[in-house]
A protein has these predicted regions:
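Secreted/periplasmic serine-hydrolase-like ester/acetyl group-modifying domain
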Residues: 1-37, 41, 141, 147-192
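Conserved, well-ordered alpha-helix/loop/beta-strand core segments that scaffold catalytic motifs
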Residues: 1-83, 88
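Generic detector of bulky aromatic hydrophobic side chains
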Residues: 2, 42-45, 53-54, 81, ...
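Short, loop-centered acidic/histidine patches that primarily coordinate divalent metals
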Residues: 47, 95-98, 127, 135
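Short, surface-exposed, charge-dense and proline/glycine-enriched linear segments
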Residues: 72-81, 119-131, 181-186
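Flexible internal linker/loop segments at domain or repeat junctions
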Residues: 84-117
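Histidine-centered active-site loop/cap adjacent to the catalytic His
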Residues: 112-163
Length: 192
């Protein structure tokens, strides 16, 4: 499939060597405080990686770490926002869930087809970027193509509900796409 090269790189590199830690989270918190103190408006988001990455993380037993990373992000944003007036609150958007965009079918490499939403499994195209900007800025997207809302604001009030929704959607995706899950498993087996 078209994404195999990138997925293998992640499986052998970043995901295989992943060690949970808070160093980057602490750096983010310091940066958010600096930006807020300087009066800079930021629009942070979790990238809409293709679900093959989420399922690869699940196959590598990293999906709970990913969920915990999201929880830590929400905690950081909540703590930073405590020190900010209402008009300066920083909103964290999550576009990484299961949507019509992130579940786009991956073409076979031999078909040489272009995908509507992705350049590769971790790089969305400018059309997706435009939809994301519209969502974050509160504009009606010109290309409202998704029946399921794309992107959600993460807060301490909804993070666990969103993670549970991702888990449900993963189970549904796995049931509906067994060949994709089997392909990921075979790819991981070939790396051992």
């Amino acid at each position: 499939k078209a994404f195999d090269f990138i997925l293998r790189r992640y499986a052998m590199g970043m995901y295989a060597k992943y060690v949970p830690g808070d160093l980057h989270i602490r750096h983010l918190e310091a940066l958010l405080h600096e930006l807020a103190d300087a009066g800079v408006t930021v629009y942070p988001f979790i990238s809409p990686i293709h679900v093959t990455h989420l399922e690869l993380m699940a196959e590598m037993n990293l999906i709970n770490d990913y969920a915990n990373w999201k929880r830590k992000l929400v905690q950081v944003f909540s703590e930073v926002n405590q020190d900010l007036p209402a008009q300066q609150q920083i909103v964290l958007w999550d576009f990484s869930g299961y949507s019509e965009i992130t579940t786009e079918k991956v073409p076979d490499l031999q078909q040489q087809q272009f995908m509507r939403w992705y350049e590769d499994s971790s790089h969305f195209n400018q059309d997706v970027g435009g939809i994301m900007l519209d969502r974050m800025l509160g504009r009606q997207s010109v290309d409202s193509v998704t029946e399921i809302p794309f992107g959600v604001v993460l807060t301490s009030d909804n993070i666990d509900v969103q993670i549970e929704a991702d888990q449900r959607n993963s189970r549904r995706y796995r049931l509906d796409n067994p060949e994709e899950i089997s392909r990921l498993q075979k790819m991981l087996d070939s790396l051992e």
